[in-house]
Amino acid sequence: MSKAGGNDSKSTLYCSFCGKSQHEVRKLIAGPTVFICDECVELCMDIIREESKSSLVKSRDGVPTPKEIRRVLDDYVIGQDFAKKVLSVAVHNHYKRLAHAAKHNDVELAKSNILLIGPTGSGKTLLAQTLARILDVPFTMADATTLTEAGYVGEDVENIILKLLQASDYNVERAQRGIVYIDEIDKISRKSDNPSITRDVSGEGVQQALLKIMEGTVASVPPQGGRKHPQQEFLQVDTTNILFICGGAFAGLERIISARGKGTSIGFGATVQAPDDRRTGEIFRNVEPEDLLKFGLIPEFVGRLPVLATLEDLDEIALKRILQEPKNALVKQYQRLFEMENVDLTFQEEALTLVARKAIERKTGARGLRSILESILLETMYDLPGLDSVEQVVIGPEVVDGKARPLYIHGDRSKDAPASVSA
């Protein structure tokens, strides 16, 4: 590998693909008779990644196998094997339903909507976002916390179908074969077990409104959002073949599950129950529909979600893998940012272990990793553009603990020293 160097125009090397000189690129790789720059290598990798996606959706008459879907999910999501299998099978069956409906009409295959339950930061939303990358059907994500009953301030449930239409460029036929992910579904649980004279417009009312579109109905969707344009023409969208995936953290559900089956008594003969010391993800494995009813979901809504997948808590090992292994791993992202300043960013193994421990202490799962790294690298990213001689930045465990500054390695290796910025 040859780096840019030398000012003699006769000895200047050029990339054989894009024509840039060795002075215009970071690195130039030499072959027997040709050269290729780092930018062209990146472009080639992007092309290969796109082709691998297209080969996925063309296998077996356009129906990707569960293993193929799982393989792509593994590239971005660490752990959660059970949830990946459930999603892979569900999406595979969704494709098969669509193919079957187009060829046969003797047996009607019903869809199986999915409910994902897992602690915060366990990867529910990331799984859905990763599915969106690999599917050849329209995909949209909605937030249940913004939904209200029709006629109240907030979004109507029909807006979910509108987003799916927008994702399909208003092609109704394609939208009717799409997949919808509704996040924060636990936030629309019934606010109380007892009926109330006041309407629960963002809880049970939204569940009631979602029932029809999840089961299958012809929804009238205003293409511009109905409330501000009441006179517009409505589009008719059949939701029968739209797959719905719902996800939520369901905070407090673990207590309902743990309490199930434990007899309660008072007085001298009462049985003292030991506290359940299992992790939240372990408790979620034993969830039953009756637990969801006690949590606040109405029976009809639970019945529309026959497939249930639970996600595990992420332990220290999994969080370290999340930092380093996926294609969009946080460490790789920050290393790329530093490469733009011609600086190599290195994390010591003990430092990554401490970052994972901090995320566990905060109980934010993988979602908390970015904020931890941002706080660690803030001063360095602020100072780096003005430091021309720095070639490498090393993050050790003391930096994560806030007891030291990152180690700056300058172009002159004899100048290895901590950052010159004062505390």
UniProtKB/Swiss-Prot annotation:
Can the keyword Membrane be found in this entry's annotation?
no
Molecular function terms in GO for this entry? ATP binding; ATP hydrolysis activity; ATP-dependent protein folding chaperone; protein dimerization activity; unfolded protein binding; zinc ion binding
GO process annotations (BP): cell division; proteolysis involved in protein catabolic process
| PROSITE patterns named in the record | CLPX_ZB (PS51902)
Q: What keywords does the record list, in alphabetical order?
A: ATP-binding, Chaperone, Metal-binding, Nucleotide-binding, Zinc
Please give the InterPro entries that the UniProt record associates with this protein: AAA+_ATPase (IPR003593), ATP-dep_Clp_protease_ClpX (IPR050052), ATPase_AAA_core (IPR003959), Clp_ATPase_C (IPR019489), Clp_protease_ATP-bd_su_ClpX (IPR004487), ClpX_bact (IPR046425), P-loop_NTPase (IPR027417), Znf_CppX_C4 (IPR010603)
Q: Indicate whether GTP-binding appears among the record's keywords.
A: no
The cellular component terms of Gene Ontology attached to this UniProt record, alphabetical and capped at eight, are: HslUV protease complex
Under Pfam families, the record lists: AAA_2 (PF07724), ClpB_D2-small (PF10431), zf-C4_ClpX (PF06689)
The superkingdom of the source organism is Bacteria
* Binding positions (ATP): 119-126
Q: So where does Zn(2+) get bound?
A: 15, 18, 37, 40
Tell me the ranges covered by the ClpX-type ZB domain, including all copies: 3-56
HAMAP family (alphabetical): ClpX
In which family does this protein belong, per the annotation? Belongs to the ClpX chaperone family.
Q: How does it assemble?
A: Component of the ClpX-ClpP complex. Forms a hexameric ring that, in the presence of ATP, binds to fourteen ClpP subunits assembled into a disk-like structure with a central cavity, resembling the structure of eukaryotic proteasomes.
Xref: NCBIfam families = clpX (TIGR00382), PRK05342.1 (NF003745)
Described purpose of this protein according to its UniProt entry: ATP-dependent specificity component of the Clp protease. It directs the protease to specific substrates. Can perform chaperone functions in the absence of ClpP.
- Protein's recorded name: ATP-dependent Clp protease ATP-binding subunit ClpX
- Species whose genome carries this gene: Methylobacterium nodulans (strain LMG 21967 / CNCM I-2342 / ORS 2060)
